[in-house]
Amino acid sequence: MIQRKLILFLFCIISLGLKAQYVYHNAEEFPLYGKISDNTELHFERLDKSLKDKVSRPYLWFLSKNTAGLAVRFKTNSKNLAFKWEVVNNATMNHMAPTGIKGLDLYCFKEGKWKFVNCARPSDNHKSEAVLSAQKEVAVSEYMVYLPLYDGIKQLEIGVDSLAFIADPEIESPRRDKSIVWYGTSIAQGGCASRPGMAHTNILSRWLDCEIFNLGFSGNGQLDYEIAEFFVQSDASLFVLDCMPNVWEQKVYENLENFYNIIRAKHPTTPILFVQNGSVRKVGDLTISSILLLQ
C-alpha cells in the first residue's frame, strides 16, 4: 500500500514537472509582421476596425479576421518551443488541411535564410497546444511563426524552456523598408496550402526578404474601393493586383480604373503589378491586356 502511494506521489511530481517545464509569454509582446494598421478589433487581424461598417459585404469583414500573412518574430535560446493558441472560428474545410487552415508554422533564420522547423498541428476544438523541437543545442536563434491562413487568432502564447529567455529579434527579416501589398482572392489568402508558410505570398516574402501585406479574401477580391483606400496608407514598394479570378467583365470595367486611381493618388510613382487570371479558357475571355487595349 505504501509502495503504491509512493509510486503515485512520484508520478504526480514528474507530471507536474513536465507541465511546468515551459514558461509562456503572450505573443502580442513581440513584433507582428504583415499587418498594415494597429487599429484592429483583435491584435491578430488584417483590416482597420474603422472599415467594419464600410466594407461592401459582411463576408469580406469576416474574412479580414483570418490571419493569412501574419507572422510573429522573436529570438530565444530555448531548445524546444511550445505554443498555446485559440482560434476564432475553429474552421474546417473538405479541400484543405487543418494545418493550413488553423495551424502554426515555425521557421528559423540560419545562414542568412529562413528554414522550416516544424508545423504545429491544431486540435479539433478552438484551443490547441503543441511542442516543437527547435534545435539540438542551446543557442540563440531567430524565429518566425506564421499564423493560420483561414481562421483567426484570439490568443497566442509562446512557451520556452524554464531556464531559457525570449526577446524581440535582432535581425529585421523580412525587411520592412521594401514591403509589398498583395491584393487578391482565395489563392492569395493561401488556399489550399498544407501549412501557413507555404502560402505563395509567404514563400515570396522569404525569397525576397520583404514584408508582404496579404490582403487576399476568398471569393471577395472584387476591386472594392474601401480596400484600396485602406492599403494605400502603407509605404509599400509595390502593389500587386491579383484579383481577376473574383471579378467579372462588368465589374472590371466599372471598378478597375477607379481602383487604380485611388492607388495612384497616394503613390504616383510606386509600381503596380497587374496579375492575369491563370484560368483563361477560351479566345475572347477577359484579360487585363484586352481591357487596357480597349481603353
PLM feature segments, named:
Residues 156-158, 192-196, 252:
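Short, solvent-exposed loop/turn and secondary-structure capping segments
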